[in-house]
Amino acid sequence: MSRFARKADRNQPEIVQALRQVGAEVRHIHRLPKMLDVIVGYRGQLFWAELKCDNEPLTEDERELIEAYKRVGVDLPVWRSTDEALKGIGAIN
């Protein structure tokens, strides 16, 4: 693991709180090397997502991970707001 722990994006607490308010189960995994930020369970589905602020770019590791899963037909979302996250899990339209 890197000498420097990965920090959570500043909007992460707000997004996680909104997800939990609609009944989602959220686990933080952003401190694990080469992982995305959260795993979210909601209404029988599991989402593995990266949380980013505004136009903050993905890191090289994040981009590589998302592309690797895309090659096998799995889309890993990048959520930049509470609305994106709630829409992403199907809690709102």
Label each PLM-derived region with a short phrase.
Residues 1-93:
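Catalytic phosphate/metal-binding cores of nucleic-acid and nucleotide-processing enzymes, i.e., regions
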